[in-house]
Amino acid sequence: MYDMKNNRQLCWDFEIVDQSQGICLRQHQPERKNVAFVADEDWEGSHCGYSRILKTPDGIRFYYRADNIDFSTYTFTHTPYVCMAESKDGKAFTKPALCRFAHKDSKDNNIAMCFDRYFDNFSVFYDENPDCPADEKYKALEGREIKAADGTSFANGASSRRRLLYYKSANGIDFEYVRELDINGFFDSYNIGFWDKETQQYFVYYRNFHDVERQWPDHSFDWRDPRARRDIRVTTSRDFVNWTQGQELSYGENAPDFQLYINNVQRYERASGWFIGRPTRYMDRAGSPKNFEHLTWNNDDSRKRLIQARGREGSAVTDCMLMVSRDGRHFNRSNEPFLPNYLENQQNWLYGDCFMTYGMLETEADFPGEPTELSMYCGEGGKNYPTRFRRYTIRMDGFLSWHADYEGGMVLTKPVTFSGDSLKINFATSAVGYLKISLCDVNGNELEGYHSGELFGNSPARPVDFGKSLAELKGKELRMKFEFSSCDLYSFIFE
């Protein structure tokens, strides 16, 4: 028996389904919207990314790595920075003058963090642990390669080691290094952390590697080896000091061993018990050289020259996937892209496409009268162009749905109980489609007075009317029957 209480039930898997006919799990894609801001300042440039959107008591903040590559020489033109933009509505962003670090002798910029060396990634999160000290409310993680001093090596004989460094800040602008975290990994991607109020612990999702045969000892590999595969691992901690052994995420039996870059895993705040991730999928297409002659960004031999100079950075392509989980370790993942590469132009089908910003934000709809939606962001352009951070939207809970075509389908749940007095559904039908809901006893027999009739429309919160009061069934074991035609059901909730 499954107790739904008064929690939102997402139709993102078939965990509560006992029987179904004509139903599939449909993945939806976000809508492309406006450019939120352009990284076109002298201290920004064509190679900006590894970004994070946060809504905190201090407002809406957008952190990103800012750097620029001269693609005539394939060299960085300045040391990478961590920059911060701000917004009041999540649609348009401004760059505040933080006046912390100088670029070309001027501090009139939005640089929030600067190193005297190259850095790969720096991810910020706001710590919602109520016991967190005030000067640590903002935390940041940096994956760094630490090299041994000249003529020396580390205990294992290596000339360098990869570590995850922890920084703290009271205001999210002035960061102070604290320590290395006791976590083993490679960390050469966007490593993220957060406090999980449901399990009362910290999660860190980070980059590591394995080999295709899974025979290498952990951390004993060369990432350049063609057998190496980029993966995502997770570790947890109650105190941000002592960490569990990292575990590789699993995606079910027979799941393709895709190479995954940034993971973008977070709690889905609208529904208890769910994690959602939007990892970037990486594929080196060096084995298809003739195709590059016809692919975009090759009209002036730019890609050919990049392949010759940097190898995989010119021959690899990337897109964004979707994965969901109930425990943060075992994920259901589609093999189709969540954010695909669009029609070819001079700024896409490149290594670095579809690296979505970590986090999402509830924003007002663009059309009057429509309900709020979820905004996400992704950098685009780059290479010979300043990076543009574009906004994308999706309806609330709209990542996946139970779907039936016009021919129809049915779902009968396992025995469940609920705690609310009313039922609301997030659904969409065609003009001829419908959804019918019946409440049944544990044997599947429809209960008198608890049939909705045909429901049609497109609403994230449609009330469902029954002939009798739901209060009479509160806490009682029953089943729910859904009958579909040309319909998507995204979620439902007893309130």
Where on the chain are the PLM-derived regions?
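Carbohydrate-active catalytic/glycan-binding domains of CAZyme proteins
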Residues: 1-495
